[in-house]
């Protein structure tokens, strides 16, 4: 892949715009997988806690680079809306032990399907995750069935599943899970659930169950 040369300059400008050394948002910059690979190796981001890169067609290459990074260990929030991370990219995040402080992972509009969710369910690296946003993907009932079996999401508090081709079948599978003791919010807007699915989820005693 073509080497990206100006990442340190972009980082400096990004920190100036955010007015601190813990937040970067490259959503309004020219930024692709090559830039992400360079960012993941930059020494000047060791204190970074919040990173946003949306709408840049980033692929699994970016996820692989971030997952292997030796300098993103303090990252708490990663927002990658409207990219092309896909199932393969989610696999890299799920298998990474280099992001131990990650609390919020937001992957709306990233072409994620059931296999991507299976990687999440099998992961042991999401113990600190409190917010997971997967809206506008296509995980379906199969994916939600996998998700219900997740063993390392015991601290998850907020789950966004808007517009994911879900039906009562997936909702019932999730409702039977005992793996989310701290879950307080589920957003299921834009799915094909009926009262049957919502009644099942109500048994989980979710504080905020968004239906529409």
Task: Show the residue positions of the predicted features.
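Leucine-rich repeat
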Residues: 6-15, 32-41, 59-68, 86-95, ...
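Eukaryotic endosomal/vacuolar membrane-trafficking regulators centered on PX-domain-mediated PI3P pathways
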Residues: 2-5, 17-19, 124, 188, ...
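Consensus "Asn ladder" position of solenoid repeat domains
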Residues: 29, 56, 83, 110, ...
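N-terminal alpha-helical scaffold/docking segments in eukaryotic complex subunits
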Residues: 17-19, 23-28, 42
